[in-house]
Structures are given as structure tokens and as C-alpha cells.
Amino acid sequence: MARLPDNKPLLCYITDGRSLPARGGGLVPSSAAKTPSAAEGSGAEGSLGVAGPRGELLLLIEQAIAAGVDLIQIRERHLSTRALLALVEAAVARARGTATRILVNDRLDVALAAGAGLHLPTHGFPVADVRRAYPALLIGASCHNRDELHRAEAGGADFIVFGPVFETPAKKPYGPPLGLEKLREAVGAAKIPVLALGGVTLANAAACLAAGAAGLAAISLFQHAADLADTVRRLRALTSE
């Protein structure tokens, strides 16, 4: 089974490119524009060298890699297959030679084509089916209760993202926040790493780790950080306090 980076806590940045307005043209670095993926084609939709939120997202992914974020989960569900593949391929290329692992949400076809890992939502492919077919693939799984957790772990997931722990607009469809006690129970029931998700901030990250979480997964914590590298340093320091 694929090995996760050996960092404490594990940090997972979940992307949300739709919340990123282009700033200053939103252009990706010239090096990226010079080496487009074959999957990008010639259309503007697939190109990562154009101005716009996708250019900003790739820049953020580069910053997250440079800062030492362990896992980057790309979940741009609104993109076409071609555009998503181009983005994931570009992210994988930038992470090559580092400890950062790139995963794509729900899209097994894109993960395999780009050489990325796969993150499975509860409504996605069964973890066991994917693990059986692809023994070496890095697989994460979203879980909202212990039954889902046990099923994902038994199926061969490498790690669990559990939540929502705290109130967050992004997770309202999943009901009220589960809270730290449910997180603690999930950690106690699992033999694989459990990452806390949902409303995680610098202010409550320590409480998640005190509940036993092996790491933290978030959108805003990383994507809207004033200084991403400093945020990562502060989160890493929590395990040494």
C-alpha cells in the first residue's frame, strides 16, 4: 500500500478554484506556459497559461508544495475532463521530487492518467474495488461516521478525512458539525491516519490534534492564508508544544 509522508501533523490542502478571483492577471509562471501538457490541447479551457482563477490555483498549489504541505487534493468538479487532467498533470509535475502527494477527488480516470492519488467521497467508487484493481494507488476516503470509516479502512484506504468537525459553509449538506468528541471516537476506532476536516483554523487546530487526529484537512486554512509558509510552520509547531 502507498506510504504517506512521514510528517506530523499531516497537512492536506483541498482546492476550491472557484473562490479564487484572478489577481494581477492570474498568469502561471512562464516555465509552466512553455511546457504544456498534451492533455491541454489548444483551447483556452484546457490551457493553464491563461489569466483567470485556474492560473491562481496553480500558483497556490506551487506555494503549498514549496511550504511543505503533505497532501493536495484537487476537487475542481466544475472543470471538464480535459481541463481537470491538465491541472492535475501540472500539479503532479510541480510536486515531482518533493514529499508532497497530489490527489484528485473522485476521478479515478484522471488520477490514473496523471499519475496522481485518488480521494474518494462517500458516494464514489467503493474503496475496496479501487484498492483491488490498483494495489499501489494512494487512496484517501471521506467519512462522516464510524460505519463509513470502518468500511473505508477495511477496503484499503491509506487515510481517512473525517468531518465536518466544526461549523463550515462548505460542509452544510452533511449536517451539523460532529465535534471533537466524535473525532476522538473516530481516531480511536481507526488503525490508519485520521485527518480532521471542516472549519479547521489556526485557533482550533491544536484541539483537533489533542483529540488524536493525525493531521488537518482544509480549504480556507491554506487557500486564504496571508502567508502560507508561515501557516504551515505554525501548524507543524503544534506537535512540538
Feature locations, PLM:
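Structured catalytic cores of enzymes that bind and process phosphorylated ligands/cofactors
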Residues: M1, A213-G215
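Conserved N-terminal beta1-alpha1 strand-loop-helix module at the mouth
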Residues: M1-K34, G46-H119, G124, R132-D158, ...
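As written
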Residues: G156, A211-A213
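Glycine/threonine-rich flexible loop motifs
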Residues: A170-K172
